[in-house]
Amino acid sequence: MIVGAMKAGTSTLHATLAQHPEIFMTKPKELHAWDMPTPPPVDSYHMHFERGRGFAIRGESTPSYAYHPGTMERLARYNPGLKLIFIMRDPVKRAISHINHSVRLRRLPEKDLFGELLADQRDMSRLDVKPFRPSPYGYHARGLCPPQISRNPRLSDASHIPLQP
């Protein structure tokens, strides 16, 4: 399971893993099965992995699993032995990429990036994004990795987790 910060490289890692002959990665990449307030029936979730029978590893990538409260706990109950890859990125570079992504999708008007960031700092309420509510201003909240990591009950002792810069 690949989780972590949006615009941190999850698509690239998903595509790279999918090229390995012993790894099956879902299509579509982001299933969003566990980041809803009520998860789907397990059978309907498992259907996404049917084509992966016979592979040594089957996986999916939904970055927002780390972001939405309760999701990591639901995943731990579903599969206590689930292997997680948590991707982080420099918060400033990630935020700029997120804003550019929102502009490309026309969720944000094409404006001066620096001006937008200053406006957000003046009106912090724009940055108060609520889980399960899409917002073009999520670039701030979705880049805060410590709260996302602390939501994972298996990361309470992170001494065994390798970190790569």
Residue ranges and their predicted role:
Residues 42, 72, 145-149:
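Short, well-ordered alpha-helical scaffold segments within catalytic/effector domains
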Residues 1-68, 74-87, 91-129:
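PAPS-dependent sulfotransferase catalytic core
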Residues 15, 73, 150, 154:
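Surface-exposed charge patches
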Residues 58-63, 132-165:
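Phosphate-binding beta-loop-alpha motif at adenosine-nucleotide cofactor sites
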